[in-house]
Protein backbone atom coordinates (compact mmCIF):
# COMPACT_ATOMS: atom_id res chain seq x y z
CA UNK A 1 0.00 0.00 0.00
CA UNK A 2 1.43 3.40 -1.02
CA UNK A 3 1.55 5.60 2.08
CA UNK A 4 2.00 9.33 2.65
CA UNK A 5 0.84 9.86 6.26
CA UNK A 6 1.11 7.98 9.57
CA UNK A 7 -2.69 7.80 9.91
CA UNK A 8 -3.00 6.34 6.43
CA UNK A 9 -0.43 3.68 7.45
CA UNK A 10 -2.27 2.94 10.70
CA UNK A 11 -5.58 2.48 8.88
CA UNK A 12 -3.97 0.25 6.25
CA UNK A 13 -2.46 -1.88 9.01
CA UNK A 14 -5.79 -2.15 10.85
CA UNK A 15 -7.37 -3.29 7.57
CA UNK A 16 -4.81 -6.10 7.32
CA UNK A 17 -2.20 -4.76 4.91
CA UNK A 18 0.96 -6.87 5.02
CA UNK A 19 3.16 -3.95 3.99
CA UNK A 20 2.89 -0.17 4.04
CA UNK A 21 5.18 1.65 1.64
CA UNK A 22 5.90 5.25 2.65
CA UNK A 23 7.27 7.13 -0.36
CA UNK A 24 10.09 8.99 1.39
CA UNK A 25 11.09 11.43 -1.37
CA UNK A 26 7.50 12.13 -2.41
CA UNK A 27 6.64 12.90 1.23
CA UNK A 28 9.59 15.33 1.27
CA UNK A 29 8.23 16.95 -1.90
CA UNK A 30 4.88 17.47 -0.15
CA UNK A 31 6.67 19.61 2.45
CA UNK A 32 7.08 17.00 5.18
CA UNK A 33 10.10 15.04 6.40
CA UNK A 34 9.87 11.64 4.71
CA UNK A 35 12.39 10.03 7.05
CA UNK A 36 10.52 11.24 10.17
CA UNK A 37 7.16 10.14 8.76
CA UNK A 38 8.57 6.69 8.01
CA UNK A 39 10.00 6.41 11.53
CA UNK A 40 6.63 7.47 12.98
CA UNK A 41 4.90 4.76 10.96
CA UNK A 42 7.39 2.17 12.21
CA UNK A 43 6.75 3.27 15.81
CA UNK A 44 2.96 3.19 15.36
CA UNK A 45 3.16 -0.40 14.13
CA UNK A 46 5.43 -1.47 17.00
CA UNK A 47 3.52 0.40 19.72
CA UNK A 48 0.20 -1.07 18.60
CA UNK A 49 1.52 -4.60 18.04
CA UNK A 50 0.51 -4.48 14.38
CA UNK A 51 1.97 -7.10 12.03
CA UNK A 52 2.21 -4.73 9.07
CA UNK A 53 5.79 -4.14 7.93
CA UNK A 54 7.25 -0.89 6.63
CA UNK A 55 8.51 -1.21 3.06
CA UNK A 56 10.16 2.16 2.48
CA UNK A 57 10.29 3.45 -1.10
CA UNK A 58 11.11 6.48 -3.27
CA UNK A 59 14.58 7.43 -2.09
CA UNK A 60 16.67 10.28 -3.47
CA UNK A 61 19.97 9.19 -1.88
CA UNK A 62 21.67 6.34 -0.06
CA UNK A 63 21.86 8.28 3.23
CA UNK A 64 18.06 8.07 3.54
CA UNK A 65 18.21 4.28 3.21
CA UNK A 66 21.02 4.01 5.75
CA UNK A 67 19.20 6.21 8.27
CA UNK A 68 16.09 4.03 8.11
CA UNK A 69 18.15 0.83 8.41
CA UNK A 70 19.84 2.24 11.51
CA UNK A 71 16.37 2.87 12.95
CA UNK A 72 15.31 -0.73 12.38
CA UNK A 73 13.49 -0.43 9.07
CA UNK A 74 15.20 -3.01 6.90
CA UNK A 75 12.71 -3.49 4.07
CA UNK A 76 13.00 -1.08 1.17
CA UNK A 77 12.61 -0.89 -2.56
CA UNK A 78 15.73 0.84 -3.86
CA UNK A 79 16.80 2.00 -7.34
CA UNK A 80 20.11 0.60 -8.65
CA UNK A 81 21.88 3.98 -8.49
CA UNK A 82 20.96 4.32 -4.80
CA UNK A 83 22.26 0.80 -4.08
CA UNK A 84 25.53 1.75 -5.76
CA UNK A 85 25.77 4.72 -3.39
CA UNK A 86 25.43 2.35 -0.44
CA UNK A 87 28.33 0.12 -1.48
CA UNK A 88 30.62 2.48 -3.37
CA UNK A 89 33.56 3.56 -1.23
CA UNK A 90 36.95 4.58 -2.60
CA UNK A 91 38.85 3.29 0.45
CA UNK A 92 37.29 -0.15 0.04
CA UNK A 93 37.87 -0.17 -3.72
CA UNK A 94 41.55 0.73 -3.19
CA UNK A 95 41.98 -1.98 -0.55
CA UNK A 96 40.42 -4.63 -2.81
CA UNK A 97 42.65 -3.54 -5.71
CA UNK A 98 45.71 -3.84 -3.43
CA UNK A 99 44.67 -7.34 -2.28
CA UNK A 100 44.20 -8.43 -5.90
CA UNK A 101 47.61 -7.02 -6.88
CA UNK A 102 49.29 -8.79 -3.93
CA UNK A 103 47.57 -12.09 -4.80
CA UNK A 104 48.57 -11.81 -8.47
CA UNK A 105 52.17 -11.07 -7.43
CA UNK A 106 52.21 -14.42 -5.61
CA UNK A 107 50.18 -16.51 -8.07
CA UNK A 108 50.34 -14.86 -11.48
CA UNK A 109 48.28 -12.30 -13.33
CA UNK A 110 44.59 -13.11 -13.72
CA UNK A 111 44.61 -15.84 -11.09
CA UNK A 112 41.82 -15.98 -8.51
CA UNK A 113 41.04 -18.33 -5.64
CA UNK A 114 38.62 -20.19 -7.92
CA UNK A 115 41.14 -20.85 -10.72
CA UNK A 116 44.34 -21.18 -8.67
CA UNK A 117 45.76 -24.68 -8.35
CA UNK A 118 47.42 -25.14 -4.96
CA UNK A 119 49.16 -28.35 -6.05
Enumerate the language-model features and the residues they cover.
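Alpha-helix-loop-beta-strand connector modules within alpha/beta enzyme cores
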Residues: 35-54, 98-113
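Conserved active-site and cofactor/substrate-binding residues in soluble primary-metabolism enzymes
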Residues: 32, 36, 60-63, 94
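Glycine-rich phosphate-binding active-site loops on the catalytic face of alpha/beta enzymes
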Residues: 2-3, 16-30, 72-92
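Catalytic cores of alpha/beta
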Residues: 5-15, 60-75
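Phosphate/pyrophosphate-binding betaalpha-module
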Residues: 6, 11-14, 18-23, 28-45
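Flexible C-terminal active-site loop/helix
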Residues: 77-119
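Short His-Asn-centered micro-motif
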Residues: 1-2, 57
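Shared catalytic-loop signature of beta/alpha-barrel
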Residues: 45, 53-69, 77-87
Amino acid sequence: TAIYTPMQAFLAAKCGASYAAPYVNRIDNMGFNGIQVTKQIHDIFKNNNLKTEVLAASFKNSQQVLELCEYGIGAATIAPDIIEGLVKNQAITSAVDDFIKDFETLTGEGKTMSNYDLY
